[in-house]
Amino acid sequence: MSSTAATAARRIEAVNDFVVKFANVNGTGSASANHLFAKAIFRMGLPVAPRNIFPSNIQGAPTWYEVRISQKGYLGRRGGVDLAVCVNAQSMVKDIAEVEPGGYVVYDSTKTLDLRLQRPDINYIGIPFTQICLREYTDPRQRLLFKNIIYVGALASLLNLDFNVFQEIVAETFKSKERLISPNMQALELGYQYAAKHYENAVGLQVVSGGEEAPHMKEFDHILMDGNTAIALGAIYGGATFAAWYPLTPSTSVVEAYEMYAKRLRIDPGTGKNNFAIVQAEDELAAIGMVIGASWNGCRAFTATSGPGLSLMSEFLGLAYYAEVPAVLIDIQRAGPSTGMPTRTQQSDILSAAYASHGDTKHVLLFPATAAECFDMTVDAFDLSEQLQTPIIMMSDLELGMNDALSPPLKWDDDRRLKRGKVLHGKDLEEMKERYGRYLDVDDDGITYRTFPGSHPSKGAIVTRGTSRDEYAVYTEDGDAYVRNMERLLKKFETAKTYVPEPKIKAASGDTNYGMIFFGTTASPGYEAVEILEEEGILLDTMRLRAFPFNAEVDQFVDEHELVFVVEQNRDGQMRRLLINECEMLPKKLVSVLHFDGLPISARAIVSSIRESIGGDNVTPIKKNIKRSETSK
């Protein structure tokens, strides 16, 4: 196949709505180049959703970077690839197979393309990346690294992108290492000029910023941020001064980001010393133990982990639940069980988190769907943990945690104050005439009054224990006292329904007997799937769950529909099971839409599953009273 002409297959023509996928070898420096491409699209004012699909080894295995450009602002995976940049021979068969008919493959034409890789229904664009690098560079490492920058430059030409934007980003990226600016600029220029000379108008995919094609982008004020960074900032603004952790993919960057920003935002202005502490513990058990100890002492503390760490922490979570000690646990979910796929995403810790530990335990869970919500919910988590005196578990995942995503700027109210809940201070204890009871339900809401150690020289001191006790924290094995305590804890969990974020409900454009429930990272593809199905005449109301325990609106939503599709990324339909277990609803009404191969679910997969489920269904639509709405995608 010629390296100077694209094949004449049918062409996909699209403006501001397509998917580019880079296929690379892990450890070759491709991530920085691919991010440069995504950042340039974003800088041009277009919604972009990049995601890094990487292996769990350090070097040598296939890695991918998928970039979705969507004028409508869809952030989830669409499914399919319109343009593939194939520079990894090891995965090329699979990579080419993913390309949509009429799509494009950019490949290294230094060697002739194997006939077995050629499809008559797609367009091939050969650029001799290796040959160019051999000609321009003598250092082997430079040849490896600059090949990536060369293909980014070529894409800038093929897609009619503003080349100045790429140059600006390179200059910004290497402003502290100016010697690297010139060679990177040269590599960009090499790729751009080659593609411009040999492939004018060869690709029907275009990016147009502003004007009639994207008029709503003129006031583009969003940011690119990953969920883990947003969580770290939420912890700082939420008042956290202590973190204990054990490194575990994909949660590690939460504490790394917390440390980086705390060094700027949590410094005593008078002494210049840190107003925070971080401990890398010997294991996950030690980490959660330190968090519970710090929280008991009045500090706002957290840990970050993933599924395997959550399993190890479960006994300590039971202690915090039963002894009623605040704590925040960040769970960045990955594919399990056991080691599973450490660098792939799932939502498969739901049940283990909700009921973590032995005995009758129930934990409050939060389900953020965006980077902005990661920030907001983390701040809320610290308030909730102290108001409810219980662990709060943030249920993020690798897709949200480790990938940059389009987000509105994070918002913070400088007048906001920490909500520490029911705390008795020294003055309160001094004025009390009755005996202080740590576990007395004074307000009949299940939430008792706590004290901080050292609040009073002679009043309010108790032994915090994981064994049974009475209302005054005195050890007892009396069955009646135990039952009273357990029933109060259940009452507190019911009270939590009035504290946690409510679900977001969006009504369809007309009456329908179908509903859809999603949460976390299934939300964006879920909303997109609903729009696709509506164009086909299939209407669905939606509910985005944001917290557990579920409030009455969840029961009402299911009751108002004949069928409700529950979209989640795990094998066993864990959210569906949790809904059935905790709510008064008929199991047959809830239909699972499941996806668990480790990649984020796509709108296409959701649409296909729902089409199949309702193919022969002709139930008459019922009237509903859907009040809340959510417009974000």
Predicted regions: what is each one?
Residues 86, 106-108, 128, 305, ...:
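Short beta-strand segments
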Residues 14-99, 242-245, 249-355, 364-385, ...:
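Thiamine diphosphate
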Residues 99-105, 120-122, 276, 299, ...:
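A short helix->loop->beta-strand "cap" motif at the edges of active sites that frequently abuts
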Residues 4-6, 51, 165-167, 178-186, ...:
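Flexible, glycine/charged-enriched surface loops at secondary-structure junctions
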